[in-house]
């Protein structure tokens, strides 16, 4: 992948990262970004997801290298764990309310399965999962729900949702998404917050 995001930087000291570490069963990858370039709509969002994918790959590599140090005291140079072809990514603008929707839990059965006031996506038919579903319905039970989801997003979008530009992206442009295509699902969104001139990229992919 030819990397186009050198004008971008990850906001590694943002307090959101400290908060999300407390949710250790959350499988979403978040990336908070500032950009030296002026906002250019679709083009800026596409740069943001390319930048975020690289940062998430670097995190994954760092984690594996740290594990090697802990296990054997030495490391080997490793390539990034997946490939990306950003030219294949296609995005569509959506309403912030669609991204941040919180469904009603109608009931919970005796084994803990929840039933909602909306249908669930079928990844085998190419349907992408919703943000709430990615947050609190991962392949293995998280124990999270609407309260935790709202709390996380109140920190992620501290000025509210009125000035958010949101794009939902296809997930056929990186093998990061391969696991999720097997069963549970995939998702990728980019959000530009006009109030604080910040991008948030939200990605998820998992299987059992």
PLM regions: where:
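Acidic, proline/glycine-rich low-complexity IDRs
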Residues: 142-208
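Extended, low-hydrophobicity segments enriched in charged/polar residues
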Residues: 2-158
């Amino acid at each position: 992948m030819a990397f186009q995001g050198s004008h971008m930087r990850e906001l590694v000291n943002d307090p959101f990262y400290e908060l999300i570490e407390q949710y250790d069963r959350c499988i979403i990858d978040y990336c908070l970004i500032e950009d030296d370039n002026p906002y250019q709509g679709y083009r800026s969002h596409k740069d943001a997801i390319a930048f975020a994918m690289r940062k998430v790959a670097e995190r994954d590599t760092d984690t594996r290298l740290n594990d090697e140090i802990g296990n054997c005291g030495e490391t080997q140079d490793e390539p990034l764990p997946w490939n990306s072809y950003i030219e294949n990514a296609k995005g569509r603008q959506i309403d912030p309310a669609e991204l941040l929707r919180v469904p009603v839990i109608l009931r919970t059965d005796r084994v803990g399965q929840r039933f909602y006031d909306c249908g669930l996506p079928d990844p085998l038919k190419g349907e992408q999962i919703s943000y709430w579903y990615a947050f609190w319905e991962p392949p293995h039970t998280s124990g999270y729900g609407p309260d935790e989801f709202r709390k996380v997003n109140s920190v992620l979008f501290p000025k509210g949702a009125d000035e958010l530009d949101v794009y939902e992206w296809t997930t056929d442009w990186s093998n990061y998404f391969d696991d999720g295509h097997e069963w549970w699902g995939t998702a990728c969104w980019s959000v530009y917050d006009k109030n604080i001139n910040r991008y948030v990229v939200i990605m998820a992919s998992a299987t059992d």
